[in-house]
Amino acid sequence: MQFAGWHRCKDADWLTRYDVYDMLCDVDTTAFQHRDKHWSLSIFCLCFFLCKNQKKERIMQIIKDYVYNFSKNSKPVATAEPGEILQFETLDCFSNRLKTEKNLITELAYSYDVANPATGPVYINGAEPGDVLVVDILDVKVADEGTITTDGVCGPLFDHSEVRTKKIKIDNGFADFNGVKFPIDPMIGVIGTAPDGEDVIDGYPGNHGGNMDSKLIKKGARVYFPVRVDGALLQMGDVHATMGDAELCGTGIEIPAVIQVKVSLIKNFELNWPVTETADRWYVNACAHNFDEALKNASLELQRLIMNATGWDETDTYMYMSVQSDVEINQACVPCEVAMILRFGTPKLPQFKPLIG
């Protein structure tokens, strides 16, 4: 006899008492119509045995506390083991302060010092400088209403728009903008680890991650971060129900969310910028205050990673990147004090080892 919860026994590193309950609920009771009543007890004993012989029982940690900067001096709000699944509950980038369309961002004394609250940080046991923190995005669930704003100073059309707040209803996976409905595609705007130097506010990106605003950092993606301090200090927030590349006016559909991730480590692997892995591509995320410098940062890192994986020299790798790799803009809402962020993507090469790992 088979029951739906079996995959949780086979694949999980650990089980909780809730998994046992779920598995028992999954049993097709019609299978017992012509069997001895002791079958039920047998199933329960089997589940108990499986749990007992798994690793130490852990219940998913739920992280709610947040900070406004990435800092090696931040006190961890939780500690996690590699392989553990964590849940982060996040505010929107305005700390949920824009309650109605009558509330304008210009009335908040808004600045990047108090923008983009990131839930965490979480100390990852065993993470040391020189390692890579691997974050698998398992799920991103958003609230039923989000916010778009213009502030009169940000983006290429700031002088062709007025300051405005627009509330966007989310219903059954669709956003409603003035009666135009389109599917949401939730993504995480701010995610990263602590830098080993000066603090970086959550609204800024850097080689630690931060406000990368990549619409590819969503459910199903795997993101790799350099570890520069003990414990890595992972934090995340600034979820968008949907956002276009470049985030033209400075916001996507900003929205509170619940994120589930799995964390793991790669020991002693050089990584200089965060990398996103999708089903078929690798993307280096890099930034600078102008396009040329951001492109150079991303190009150098992607070239290095491809060379390590293939054994090609610099020139062959440069040529290959020119014909098979694409530059895409994460955020470019200039003029804006936030640096330009881009991603440089290349297809996975089944003939060679992965770029990371």
Model-derived segments and their meaning:
Residues 9, 25, 45-47, 51:
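Cysteine-centered motifs
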Residues 60-110:
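N-terminal, Lys/Arg-enriched amphipathic/low-complexity engagement segments
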Residues 62-71, 112-119, 200-208:
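Short, structured beta-strand/loop micro-motifs enriched in basic residues and often containing a Trp
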Residues 93-103, 140-150, 231-241, 330-332:
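Short, Lys/Arg- and Gly-enriched loop/turn segments at beta-strand edges
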Residues 139-219, 224:
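Intrinsically disordered, low-complexity linker/loop segments enriched in Gly/Pro
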Residues 269-320:
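A hydrophobic, small-residue-rich beta->alpha segment in the mid-to-C-terminal subdomain
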